[in-house]
Amino acid sequence: MSSELKVGYRTVDGLQIRYADSNGSASQHLVLTSPWPESLYAFDRMWSRLSGIARLLAIDLPGFGRSERRIDLLSPTAMSEFLIRILDEWNISDPHLVCPDVGTPAALFAAAGHPGRIRSLVIGGGATAYPLEVAGTLKDLIEAPGIDAFRSVEPRALVEGLMAPIGPAAPAGDIIADYVESNMGDRFAESARYVRSYPEQLPLLAGLLPRIFTPVQIIAGGRDPIVPVTNAEFLHARLPNSRLDVLDTGHLAWEEASGEYGAIIAAWVNGGYLVGNTGMGRT
């Protein structure tokens, strides 16, 4: 593997969880959770930059990446409590959480349920609006009568189809191979249980948003065909202390514009989160 990430496994609540730890001595902690159907290697190209400003811990959430799953964790509310369990396991207090894609609703539930436990959030690219505003494969996954139809999805075709729109911005072949392996067997279909909980979970989240005073940096792709930017705008309009940056990308903003994405995180961690509600930027 050509990545800078040093990966290991740790047992948390009986599950083997894959993680990468920068082992730095910085006073601030940055905890990053994997997007789906990718893995913690989605942060590879910003790892060096971010490890210079904070100690990093990247996690494949249960059921995603290469971590073991447990069915009862496959909803944002349940995953939010597992996120807090991760922080306890690593003895991390007052972290910044970077939770794109499926991590977004879980991170928001964690902030709502544990005021003061999390210093700030960096989120986006995950469905959060209610009524739901989703499209493409995500819409199909949510609206299908069951998950059996997705058991035959070929992982390489799935990953290569997701990466095709970003062309040369796609990661190296060994990282693509990790994404493929992360969805082998029944992993993709079973992980779909998480997004299929959105119709019940997102109305609950919507009611909590005005009471989340944790600073929140939202990063969205302005051309996202799966999770339209209206999801980010929905959050920004309701969160009392948020900033929204819209990048000129599709869904995979963290891959397609990894430099800009990492720069926004760095600026946020270096004090941007202290500024308060700063409106919206487009780049």
Sequence positions of predicted segments:
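Conserved alpha/beta-hydrolase catalytic His-Asp/Glu region
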Residues: 132-134, 152-211
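N-terminal cap/lid segment of alpha/beta-hydrolase-fold proteins
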Residues: 1-16
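Conserved serine/cysteine hydrolase catalytic core
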Residues: 187-237, 248
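Flexible "cap/lid" loop of the alpha/beta hydrolase fold
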Residues: 112, 119-150
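Active-site loop/oxyanion-hole signature of alpha/beta-hydrolase fold enzymes
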Residues: 13, 20-23, 58-99, 263
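Catalytic active-site module of serine/aspartate enzymes centered on a nucleophile-bearing elbow/loop
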Residues: 242-283
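Conserved HGGG/HGGXW glycine-rich cap/lid loop of the alpha/beta-hydrolase fold
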Residues: 15, 21-66
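Gly/Ala-rich beta-loop-alpha elbow adjacent to hydrolase catalytic centers
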Residues: 99, 103, 107
